[in-house]
Amino acid sequence: MATEYALRMGDGKRVFLTKEKIMAEIEAGTANAADLGDIPALNDNEMDKLAEILMMPGKTVSVEQGMEIPVTHDIGTIRLDGDQGNSGVGIPSSRLVGCMMHERAFGADTMELGHIDYSFKPVKPVVSNECQAMEVCQQNMIIPLFYGAMPNMGLYYTPDGPFENPGDLMKLFKIDKAKESMEHAAEHLTRDTVWVMQKLFASGADGVNFDTTGAAGDGDMYGTLYAIQALRKEFPDMYIEAGMAGEMVLGMHGELEYDGVRLAGSWPHEQAPLIAKAGANVFGPVCNTNTSKTSAWNLARAVTFIKAAVEASPIPCHVNMGMGVGGIPMLETPPIDAVTRASKAMVEIAGVDGIOIGVGDPMGMPISHIMASGMTGIRAAGDLVARMEFSKNMRIGEAKEYVAKKLGVDKMDLVDEHVMRELREELDIGIITSVPGAAKGIAAKMNIEKLLDIKINSCNLFRKQIA
C-alpha cells in the first residue's frame, strides 16, 4: 500500500494523500494561479520542494537557518484581549501589556496597536485615547510599533455612514449613482485615514498598517492609495505597510484608476507597483484559501501568486498569512502543521521579505510563524532588520547585510541568541530580559538610531518634549 501523508483541507480538516496525489494537487494549484494571473507556474524543482515541505514528518517545520525574515501583524493585541467568538482568546489585559507580550514573550520583530473595532472611521471619536495609548507603548517598547486599522469603506454607506449603499442602488439599476456614492466614500476614507494618522504620528507611532485594503472593492483601494500618497508627502519618514484584502481587486466601480492603471481586476503582481508608487514601504500581497481544496492545492496556488508579486514589487513584500489566506486553512485555531509549512514555503520558494501575521489564536499565528520563520525580535536582531526594510525600503538580503555590517557580525549571527544577547547589552540597544540599568524604551531606541544611522519617530517626539 502506498504511503499516505497527513495534510489539511482548506477548512483545516485532516486528510491523507499519497505522494502522487500531492504532486497532482500542487500541479493543479499552480496551474490555476498561472492561468488566472497570466504568470509563470512553479517549475519542477519548486514543485518538488513544495511537496518535500508538505511531506516532512514533523508536526512543525521551519526555514533553513539563515533564511529567517521579520514579521509584521494584523489585528494587534485583539488576538489576546478580543473575545468575539472568532480568534481572540479573551484574556483581560491592557493593550500595553498585549504589545509588550508580543515583544518580550512571543519574540515579535514588530507590533501594532489597534482599536477594538479595527477600522479607521470608528477611531475618530476616540483618537485622543488612541494617541495616549500609543505614547505609553512607545515609551516602554523597543520594536517598531505601528497603528493598524482597516480602511473599511463599507462603513461609509448606509446604515453606518452618510452615503447610499451602492449595492442597493445597483439593484435599482442606478449604476451612475452607485459609482458616485463609491467616489464620495473613497474621498472620505482618504480624509479620515490621513487625519487619524496625523494624530497618531504626532504621538510617536512608527507608522501605519493598512489592513485588508480593497475589502469593499476598487473604491476602497483607490481611497487607500491616495491616503498613502498624502501621508508619504506629509511624513517622509513614516513607516507604511499596505496589506490587501484579497488576491484580486473586485470591480465594484469598475473604472477607477491610479497612475493610469485600472484597479478593478488587478492581481498581486499588478497591485505591488501601485502600492509602491503611492509611497508605501512594504506591500502585503494576499492569496485566498479555498476551503474545499487541499493544503497542497492552496499552498501551491498561493506561492505561485506571491512569488510573482515579490518579483514584480519594487518594495519589500510581507505576505499576509492569517487564517484563510496564504495557503493557511480557514479556522480560528489554525493547525500548527499547516501554518509552519505555509510559512516555510513562502520564505524558501516565494522569496518573501517578511510575513504579516494575521487573524488566528496566539499559538496558531504569532507563535507558530515566529517559530517557523521569524527573526525573534529583540531576542536577536529582528527589530533592527525590520527597521531597515521600513526606513529604507531594503529587501531582506540588503537589510540583513546592512545590519550585520553595522553590528560587526556575520548575517547568521543576526538570529543567534547567544551572540545577540551579549551584543545588545554591550551596545545598550535593548534586551529581552529585565536587567537593572540597561537602556529600555526610548533610551534603547535612541541608541538604535545611532547604530543604524536612522531616525525613529518616538525619539523625535521625546527630543521635542525635552527641548
UniProtKB/Swiss-Prot annotation:
GO BP field: methanogenesis; methylation
EC number: 2.1.1.249
Keyword Nucleotidyltransferase: no
Keywords: Methanogenesis, Methyltransferase, Pyrrolysine, Transferase
Leading EC class: transferase
Gene Ontology terms for molecular function: dimethylamine methyltransferase activity
Disulfide bond positions: none
Signal peptide location: none
Catalysed conversion reaction: Co(I)-[dimethylamine-specific corrinoid protein] + dimethylamine + H(+) = methyl-Co(III)-[dimethylamine-specific corrinoid protein] + methylamine
Biochemical pathway: One-carbon metabolism; methanogenesis from dimethylamine
Domain of life: Archaea
Pfam families referenced in this protein's UniProt entry, alphabetically: Dimeth_Pyl
Presence of the UniProt keyword Repeat in the record: no
Coiled coil: none
Matches recorded under NCBIfam families: dimeth_PyL
Family of this protein: Belongs to the dimethylamine methyltransferase family.
Functional description taken from the UniProt entry: Catalyzes the transfer of a methyl group from dimethylamine to the corrinoid cofactor of MtbC.
This protein's name: Dimethylamine methyltransferase MtbB2
Species: Methanosarcina barkeri (strain Fusaro / DSM 804)
